[in-house]
């Protein structure tokens, strides 16, 4: 994993992508995500964030309990990891992850063909149009180490950085 600083001023270029997602079209969404990762890498981006539940769409509702959909997501992540093996970019991609009887709303953290870990959503909204507790379990209190997408063990945990503070440079990077 070579993430050398590409700019002379010592900054890493980061980006967020918001590709068009089709509900339950895991293969199509994986292809669009791969395009976004490749384009970002070509532009010198070193860290890319893709949307929550990128592989399924956020509105898949009760389909999140469909084992075929869950297996398709894991297979798509295997493909994405394989096809990004040569890229020097860290990226996250959202997908549901089943562990035992629970399904977690996760972001897979990936780089150079490796699954570095899975960050699970801790606070699940359950009001108005949000019914996440119907489909997902909150992140486990303690990190779990699991085998997923042909790799592992990898951590599945909730990560909070509430103690960090950031400074805006005010410069167009």
Predicted regions and their residues:
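Enzyme catalytic cores with a strong preference for nitrogen-chemistry domains
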Residues: 1-171
């Amino acid at each position: 994993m070579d993430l050398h600083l590409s700019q002379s001023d010592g900054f890493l270029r980061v980006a967020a992508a918001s590709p068009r997602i089709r509900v339950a079209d895991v293969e199509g969404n994986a292809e669009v995500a791969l395009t976004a990762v490749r384009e970002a890498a070509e532009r010198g981006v070193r860290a890319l964030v893709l949307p929550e539940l990128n592989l399924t769409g956020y509105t898949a509702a009760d389909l999140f309990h469909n084992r075929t959909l869950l297996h398709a997501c894991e297979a798509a992540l295997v493909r994405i990891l394989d096809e990004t093996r040569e890229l020097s970019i860290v990226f996250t991609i959202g997908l549901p992850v089943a562990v035992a009887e629970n399904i977690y709303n996760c972001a897979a953290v990936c780089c150079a063909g490796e699954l570095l870990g899975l960050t699970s959503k801790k606070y699940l909204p359950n009001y108005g149009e949000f019914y996440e507790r119907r489909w997902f379990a909150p992140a486990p209190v303690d990190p779990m180490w699991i085998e997923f997408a042909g790799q592992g063990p990898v951590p599945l945990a909730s990560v909070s950085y509430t103690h960090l503070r950031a400074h805006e440079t005010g410069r167009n990077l």
